[in-house]
Structure formats: structure tokens, C-alpha cells
């Protein structure tokens, strides 16, 4: 009888020892697998230089795009400068070597040959359709025209500020602007924008939601339109979508690597939407209208002072993203 009890106790103790040994063996094997896996992951991360992107992604409709830039932090010596000018400037100068001449003059101000790029555009309307600013510093020359004041101010507002934009499905949804920074930006070969404000019952205020002819017209056949309506009120929109793209945009703040030089005109254009604030003229400058050679000489002479009012950056305005990023 006692022999059976001793045997049972012995078997129980041996079982405990065996189970303990098995568990320790499993633990060592799992530790080996886990540590080896982590080692491989770390090694692969170092080799591939992988970046882990979180779920908080930026709005995909941003008109900004990152681009590779080999310049250093030293001002002027290795930065790039883009100078945008209307085609009438080169037509008036009528000299095939005038850009080389300007490059040599910029060299006297500390800008190495090859660091200054000359970008030509047809006119304000054409430039408004798809402005693209790629350099560390961008200076846009706009000749003043009293008949194009609104177009010039809207273009300046677009390129002097950073915007985040989302697509708008105006056939299915009503839209409202939440605050002063919220605007609807339209670009295309011909943009006609009509709006119908709605009351709390989604009935038109002074218009019929089913009849676009009763909508209020805020823009007709324009290339660039920045629409500002009453904040906090839903609107039904009618847009010439075949020739125009509209986006719901939020102004983030100044794009400090861009400056606009107004050529001619009595006063600098005010691009402030709020009539109760002081005119927004940051990085808006003016030179007297003479000959285009005189304009370029003035820019060269004051280029470093102009740059001091700006901030270098390595992101560009690429409005192609306005059309294709959704």
C-alpha cells in the first residue's frame, strides 16, 4: 500500500519536473525566434531606410509637392532663384543673349551662374491656369493692367499663400464655407461659377435649387476664380465642370518663398479678402514701369533685399496636383 503511494508521489514529481523543463525549452525557443525576427526587422530597416507613415496623412489635394533639392543652408551661394516674367518682356528686349547678360549681373550680387532660372509666361490669364513655382526662391513679375486688377489680385492670393484643397462633388452635395480662410478655388480654360444660398430647410434664398438660371453669378468665363461666400450657409453650386475644376480649399498661411513684383500702377494691389483689415502686402512689391531692361536692372540691384523678406523652402507649388490629386 505504501509502495503504491510512494510511486504515485514520485510520478507526480517527475511530471512536474518534466513539464517545467518543457516550458523552459519552449520559452528559450520562442525567445530565440522573437529576437531573431526583431534582428532581421532592424537589419532590413537599416538597409532599406524604410519610413513608417502613420494614419494621420495630409489632405491629398494639397497644391504643394515635395521635390528633391540639393541646395545647402547657405543663403544665395547654393540656393536657386526663379524669375517669372511675361513674354512681352523678351519681345521688347529682342536680344537672344539677354538672359545670359542678366545671369552675369546676378553673379555680381552673389548668385552663381546656373542658380537663376528665367521662366516665361504668356499673360496673367494663362499663368493663372497652372502656376508652378519650383525654386527655393520665386519672384513673379506682373505688369499692371487696370482691366486685370481682379485677376492679378487673385493670382497673387493663390501663389503668396499655402492652400490645402479637397475635391467637390457639386452634383450630390451642398457646401458651406466655415471661416474666412475657407475658399472655393476654380481653375480651367473657362470657369463660370453660380451659387444659390440655402436656408435651414435647404430651400433657395432668392433662387430655385432646380433652376441654375436663378443662381447668382459670381464669375464668368475666367481662368482662375477664388470664390468667397457667406460663412456658415449651405450653397448649391453650378460650375462649368467641362472646362473648369473646383476645389474646397483652406488657406494655411503665407508661402514665404514667393514674392510678387507689380510693374507699374499707382498703388500695390491689395489681396486681402477681409475689408476690415489692413491691406495684405507682404512680399507684394512695386517698381515703376519703364522699359523692361530697367525693370530687370532694378530686380538685380535689389534682389538680396527682396530675398531677405522671404524664407527659403524645399516645397513647390505644383497646381497640377490641383487637378489630379483627389
From Swiss-Prot:
Protein name from the UniProt record: Outer capsid glycoprotein VP7
Modifications made to the protein after synthesis: N-glycosylated.
Glycan-carrying positions: 69
Binding-site residues for Ca(2+) 2, renumbered to this chain: 177, 228-229, 231, 301
Assembly information from the UniProt record: Homotrimer; disulfide-linked. 2 Ca(2+) ions bound at each subunit interface in the trimer hold the trimer together. Interacts with the intermediate capsid protein VP6. Interacts with the outer capsid protein VP5*.
Presence of the UniProt keyword Glycoprotein in the record: yes
Annotated binding of Ca(2+) 1, by residue: 95, 206, 214, 216
